[in-house]
Amino acid sequence: MNVALRRAYELERKGLEFYINSASKSNNALVKRTIFSLAKEEISHMMKIDEISSSLDASGKWIGEEIGFKGSDIEVEIRKFFEKTDKEILDASKDNTDLIKKAMEFEKKSYELYDDLSKKAGSDIEKRFYDELKKQEENHFDALQNVDYYLTETGDWFEKDESNVWSWMNS
């Protein structure tokens, strides 16, 4: 595995470990579902990194043009859970904001790593791959931020960029 992919893989592995450990500490159903959804996406990222690494090891080439992450839409998954779960359950035990903040920091570090790797990429396909991972980490951050807004019920919700706010949580 090349150095950049190894760094990416290790970061995703640490994220998975963090999310699995964090889920067991949460008493809030929304936080727990969000954390498990993020853990699932970390596994998806690790699998894609491993797939690319295997291709590089075997042929010295990045795999074809298909580098995206299929079915990776955390907002859709959280929305489905949110809409089918009683408000009492969603609002129970809103004490996990510190866990959410730590997760947001982790996603920010992930974004920064992929931004750096994208800038140092040796090919267009490698750059696109790291840019896609950056986008994924940004989506993860937005998910965590929206859950944090929901849990803390801060007025900050309305001051943020509308494109990042899940207004359906506030209805």
Segments from the language model and where they lie:
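Non-heme di-metal
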Residues: 1-171
